[in-house]
Each structure stands twice: as structure tokens, then as C-alpha cells.
A protein has these predicted regions:
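Cytosolic small-GTPase signaling regions in large eukaryotic proteins
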Residues: 1-105, 109-112, 117
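Conserved ATP-binding subdomain of kinase catalytic cores across diverse folds
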Residues: 73-229
Length: 230
């Protein structure tokens, strides 16, 4: 799905337009009806997310949450119509609806959306993703692919960095989907817990790890991973 969206978007490129058109035509020819129908559903889902993102960004700050709640209704209507859809960010996952109460937006400059889908697998957990508009996620995709390659090399050499490499998919120029890592904590938040001069202290992160990894084996695993980065 991601490749078809990028190829369609790339048809506006001046120098390689004809090549992208040929690649897209070949992909669509080989896909068959069932896969083409799935591509159409995912494309419509991305279009709705893009429209919601634009409306949330254009709304005044006090009205943004209300606008988001209203626009989430479009996603609910979408799933009522198509029943299920594969998640473009991870085609192995199938989604069947929206957890309205778990949806929100982040207050950073680009105002990305946090969207939580209901897993079509009754045994699976709900799936949260970030929809970003205004950033070129093609660069993020490249960096994450390089990190994945490096992590494979490190593991082959016996260096386990305890890496969690999240998924990222550019769905067009300046927009895309990012996997939300459960229970992730930013360095900024860790530093804030240590007070004003927290970022200047050498043991800030080590102390935080110690507080949140009570088992000796877990703490040693974290320390070993940190040491492997040096």
C-alpha cells in the first residue's frame, strides 16, 4: 500500500514522472482485483485521516478537540461501510473500527493525530498510530531502515542494544503514519523528573533506569545495552 501511495505522489516529480507512472502501472496490473480493492480501502482511509488532520490544524486551539471528535465520525462511517481494512503501516494487522475515546492530537507544531483503531482480531489489543502532516517522513523511513540494518549487524557480533525499531510509512508528500511505541518515555520527560539541572547530571538516566527496573537482571540488561553504545 505504501509503495502505491508514494508512486502516485511521485508522478508529480518533474524528471522521473514517466518512470514512476510505468512502475505504478506494472504494480496495479499484477495486483489483481482483491488486492486492488484493499488498496482502494487503505487509500480512502489515508484520505480521511489527511482531511481530519487539516481540519484540526485549521481550527482554533479551544475548538480542536471538539473538531477532532466530530471528524472521528467520518472514520466510524468508513468502517461501517467497509467492515474491515488492513493497516497501511503494517499489512499483517487488520482493523475494524475506531476507539473514539482514545483518539487525540499532540500539541507540537505539526499537531499530529493520535488515532486508535480497534483490532479485527478479538484476541488482539487496540492499535494506536500517529498521523503526521507537514513532515517529510521519507527521511525517517530511510534512517529507520539503516538502524534496522545496523541492529542486525550488532546482533550478529553479539552486541544487543535492546533496540525497539518502530514502523514509519510515508503516504505522500509531507504526510505519513508512525507506530506508537507502548509505554515509551522521552529523554526530556526523564530529565524533567530530575529538576532544573537534570540534563547536566551524568547519572540522571542511570538513576531513572534503576528506579524503573527493580529486578537486578532487568537493570543489568539495560546497563549492558547502554554500555554497548559507547
Amino acid at each position: 500500500m505504501g509503495s502505491t501511495l508514494l508512486l502516485k505522489d511521485a508522478q508529480n516529480e518533474t524528471y522521473f514522472k514517466s518512470w514512476y507512472q510505468k512502475l505504478l502501472a506494472a504494480l496495479q496490473f499484477c495486483s489483481g482485483k482483491a488486492l486492488s480493492d484493499e488498496f482502494s480501502k487503505e487509500k480512502k482511509l489515508i484520505k480521511i485521516l489527511g482531511d481530519i488532520g487539516e481540519k484540526v490544524k485549521s481550527a482554533s486551539d479551544p475548538q480542536r478537540q471538539e473538531v477532532l471528535k466530530k471528524e472521528i465520525g467520518r472514520l466510524e462511517e468508513f468502517f461501517q461501510c467497509i467492515k474491515t481494512c488492513h493497516l497501511p503501516l503494517n499489512p499483517a494487522l487488520c482493523i475494524k473500527g475506531i476507539d473514539r475515546d482514545a483518539c487525540s492530537y499532540f500539541t507540537s507544531h505539526a499537531l499530529p493525530l493520535k488515532i486508535t483503531f480497534i483490532n479485527a482480531n478479538p484476541m488482539g489489543k487496540n492499535i494506536s498510530i500517529i498521523f503526521k502532516a507537514g513532515d517529510d517522513l521519507r527521511q525517517d523511513m530511510l534512517v529507520l531502515q539503516i538502524i534496522q540494518v545496523m541492529d542486525n549487524i550488532w546482533l550478529q557480533e553479539g552486541l544487543d542494544m535492546q533496540m525497539i525499531i518502530y514502523r514509519c510509512l510515508s503516504t505522500g508528500k509531507g504526510q505519513g503514519l508512525v507506530q506508537m511505541v507502548p509505554d515509551a518515555i522521552t529523554l526530556a520527560k526523564i530529565h524533567r523528573h530530575s529538576g532544573l539541572i537534570g540534563p547536566l547530571k551524568e547519572n540522571t538516566i542511570k538513576k531513572w533506569f534503576s528506579q524503573h527496573n527493580h529486578l537486578k537482571a532487568d537493570y543489568e540488561k539495560v546497563c549492558l545495552a547502554a554500555a554497548n553504545f559507547k
